[in-house]
Design a protein with these regions (language model features):
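Alpha-helical recognition/docking segments in bacterial nutrient-uptake
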Residues: 16, 23-135, 139, 207
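Bacterial carbohydrate/catabolite-sensing allosteric modules
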Residues: 9-10, 50-60, 102-110, 114-306
């Protein structure tokens, strides 16, 4: 008590950083950006995930640190991150980054990653979602289809590969197989997850001798880029070509025509991942290690029946 009274008389203000150091806490959690900053923050899906995480951080009095790759290496960024825990996107258990986090004794949760006993995760059923939206495209009469993947490896990926692009590709192929179609490599293009690259992909599709009747993209922002490329070329959507996306970002219902898509609740993914991480930081038991949340197929004007 005497020490406290003396400190008050002297106008001493406790240093919160020193207190945090004594508790071995930084009062910050990190979110590993899936791409470099300029790409990640252009992606509305990623921004909604960040929004969901940020709301939970505010509730617990923590800051949120966005961690981009350091010298193009996300592993190096994790080695030096001053955080109490990490949320990642698309992480698989065999990645080097997992061993780095385990060595640092950092709790972590992955969004859109591979479910594993060692790695808490928040996902939707990506394969089934893509099966259902491709079935919708096929039921609309489309057979000349181009898929826009987010991974070079998705077309030839083994069945055991549980990355999101590969699970989505399996869903598309399964729906096509039901009607006797086999996906050809020439039908698959690869895009960065940006609108600019979506425009590039759209122009590449339009330059083909035989134009597809429908483009199915693994990302709304890429699908919207394709629509813009078509409009710039004077084509009508969906009269000249249908376009389908994935994510249900806000822009998908603002563009004309509105985009047919898969609604996955990005903000809720971020919220659930952050809540799970705080339970781990506080040494509490998780109610569920792997959380799978619902999705919805939303048909809008960008898909036309033939």
């Amino acid at each position: 008590q005497q020490i406290l009274e003396t400190a008050e008389k002297l106008g001493y203000i406790p240093d919160p950083m020193a207190r945090n150091f004594s508790l071995r806490r930084h009062l910050s959690i990190g979110f590993l950006l899936p791409q470099m900053v300029q790409f990640s923050l252009q992606n509305p899906y990623t921004l909604q995930v960040i929004f969901g995480i940020g709301n939970v951080c505010e509730k617990y009095g923590y800051t949120l640190t966005l961690i981009p790759p350091l010298h193009k290496s996300i592993t190096e960024a994790v080695r030096s991150a001053a955080v109490d825990g990490l949320i990642t996107m698309g992480m698989q258990v065999e990645m080097e980054i997992v061993s780095v986090m385990q060595t640092r004794l950092l709790p972590y949760v992955t969004i859109d990653g591979t479910p594993d006993a060692q790695m808490p995760s928040v996902n939707i059923d990506d394969e089934q979602a893509c099966f259902e939206i491709m079935r919708l495209v096929l039921e609309a009469g489309h057979r000349d289809i181009v898929l826009v993947s987010l991974s070079e490896d998705a077309f030839a990926s083994p069945a055991k590969d549980q990355s999101v692009p590969n699970k989505r590709m399996r869903g598309y192929r399964r729906a096509m197989a039901e009607v006797g179609l086999e996906l050809q490599k020439s039908q698959v293009l690869v895009s960065e997850c940006t609108m600019e690259d979506g425009i590039r992909i759209g122009k590449e599709i339009l330059a083909r001798k035989i134009r597809p009747t429908c483009v199915v993209a693994m990302s709304d922002i890429v699908a919207i880029g394709c629509i813009l490329a078509c409009k710039q070329a004077g084509l009508g959507i969906p009269d000249d070509m249908s376009v389908v996306g994935f994510d249900n970002i806000d822009e998908s219902s603002c563009i004309m025509p509105q985009l047919t898509t898969v609604d996955q609740p990005a903000k809720e993914k971020g919220r659930l991942a952050a809540e799970a991480l705080f339970r781990m930081i506080n040494k509490e038991t998780l109610e569920s290690v792997h959380m799978e949340i619902p999705y919805r197929i939303i048909r809008r004007e960008s898909l036309k029946s033939r």
